Structures are given as structure tokens and as C-alpha cells.
Amino acid sequence: MVVTEYELKPQNFPRFPLDWSEIFGRKAKIVVEIGFGNGEFLAELARRHPEKDFVGFEVSITSFVKAQKKFKRYNLKNVRLVKVDARFGLRELFPDNSVEKVYINFPCPWPKKRHESRRITSYDFLQTLSAVLEMDGTVEFATDEEWYAREVLDTFESSEYFVVDVFEENFKRDVETRYERKWKSQGKKTFLIVARKVKNGTVKRLMEGENTMAHSVFEGNVTWEKLKELEGKVFKDKNKIFVVKKVYRDGDYLLKVISTDEGGFQQVYYLNLSGRDGKWVLKLDEGSDPYRTPALKWSLRRIPEELTAQGSP
């Protein structure tokens, strides 16, 4: 299941949420950092607290490379990394009441209105935190944007699930990030908020339970012309959507698909279509490794329906 010594591929695990005691080989407190950057902060935390286990989320490949070099240098055994949007990962990979602390250090503030759902002040993300944090577990949020700090403060203070223990300007911490040191050296203001969970929340997960393999077996007269007609076609159903971006032919057929699930979680993957004598199998291509979300599974059902529909455009 471990792709490198530190990187996990949760999409290949048999059940969701994950059993972190099995992954680390022990039962220990779990600490999460969202957006670990070059890994400096996470590495130092893991080094200072060998009794705890640490999980970092990032989407940058460069960050993964830099972070793992640091972990290897310290010979750390208590840290794992996941390359996925943390809004999805925190909700889907951790059971309720399983995380002791979440660090969010100097995230992008997403100032534009159309991006506000990406902020930690969004309702969905707050619900996730209220579910996965253990009782009295904390969120530690640091930023150099005062308006963002005030917005986060207001969000936690108005929540029934949290109380704010700390709101501090120009704070000092034992472990600092690169940006923290940079802003302080430039005399720029920094802000720290620590919110503590006081009430259990609930969250709707997309992938709870067994992580089953996805494929479709069907019969019909599938032609290259029918497949090409799928290109650019958008399929919508309630809280999920997908589009067939491109169809390729090289022996079998290959379909490039982009899907979006409830909450805005987007994936790009390839489906392999192979068949003989009117019998077909549509499955994930071996080169694709997405999460088996409702939108992905629906694309595997809906595409055969479209290809075999009588009189379909």
C-alpha cells in the first residue's frame, strides 16, 4: 500500500475510512498538517514527538520530494503523506473522533468570491473538522492576512462545535515554518488561532465502507462512431457530474474522463473498453489510480447505457 517509504495511496486500501493503527503498526495519537509545503514543520513535529503519528496532505509533487528527503534524513517512522485535496482526504480517510490536532499553516486565503468554498471557513470543512477531531482536539491556524484571520475567528466563535482558546497577533511557536520566519523578518503581522472541539459534529462521506473495484460488463453494437460522439458530452445526476474529454483507439479503446463529486472533488482518469463479438468490458485503465467515488462508479454505468441506447444521438 505504501508507494514510497512515506507516501500512501489510500485509493488502493480495502475500506474507508482507513485504519491508521494498521498503517503505522501501533495505536497512537494522530496529528494532521494540511499543506505541508517543503515538509520542514511536519518533520520537526514528528522528530520531537515520536510517541505520536503524523499525516500530511499536499498536492504538489515537488513538495513530496522535498519533504521525504527531510524525513529520510531524520529516519522518521511516524509520518505518512497523502497526495489529495485535504478537504476530501480529511473527511474520507479518518474516522470520527480520531484526530488529536490539525495544523493549517499560512494557506492560500482564496480572496475571490468564487473561491470562498476553498477556505477553511466553509461550512463543509467545518463539519469535517467537527466530526474527525477527537473531543477537545484542536485546529491550529496561522496566517499573515488579517482579514482572513478575522473571518476564521468569527467562524469558529459562531460555531456550536468549537471554542477559541487562542487568538494572537505576532505569535511565537517552538516550531516555525519557512513563511513564518520570512514574514517575521520582514516585520509583517502574523496571526494564530487555536480552536478546540467541544461538541461532536457529523459529516456525510462519499466512500464509507468497502472500496470495491469498479467495472461494467455489457452487450451491444459499439462502434468507433458512437464512441467519438461521446467526446465533450457532459453527464449530470444530482450531486455528481462527468465529461468524456477524449476517446482514443489503439487495439482497445481508451476514454479520458473528468468527474466531479459532491463537494467539488474532481478527478481525471482513463477507462479501458475492450470487447469481442458484441460483449464488452469497461474498466479503469491500469495506468489510472483514482478514488472509486460515486461519480466515477456512475460513469462506468452510464457510458455503457449511452453506447447501447437505441436511437441515441
Swiss-Prot record:
GO biological process, one term: tRNA methylation
KW rRNA-binding (keyword) present: no
Keywords: Methyltransferase, S-adenosyl-L-methionine, Transferase, tRNA processing
Assigned GO CC terms: tRNA methyltransferase complex
Pathway: tRNA modification; N(7)-methylguanine-tRNA biosynthesis
Reaction it catalyzes: guanosine(46) in tRNA + S-adenosyl-L-methionine = N(7)-methylguanosine(46) in tRNA + S-adenosyl-L-homocysteine
InterPro entries: SAM-dependent_MTases_sf, tRNA_(Gua-N-7)_MeTrfase_Trmb, tRNA_methyltr_TrmB_bact
Keyword Transcription regulation carried by entry: no
Residues noted as binding S-adenosyl-L-methionine in the record, renumbered to the chain: 33, 58, 85
Top-tier EC class: transferase
E.C. code: 2.1.1.33
PROSITE patterns hit by this protein: SAM_MT_TRMB
A single MF term (Gene Ontology): tRNA (guanine(46)-N7)-methyltransferase activity
Residues that hold substrate according to the record: 112, 144, 177-180
Family of this protein: Belongs to the class I-like SAM-binding methyltransferase superfamily. TrmB family.
Purpose of the protein: Catalyzes the formation of N(7)-methylguanine at position 46 (m7G46) in tRNA.
Protein name (Swiss-Prot/TrEMBL): tRNA (guanine-N(7)-)-methyltransferase
Organism from which the protein derives: Thermotoga maritima (strain ATCC 43589 / DSM 3109 / JCM 10099 / NBRC 100826 / MSB8)
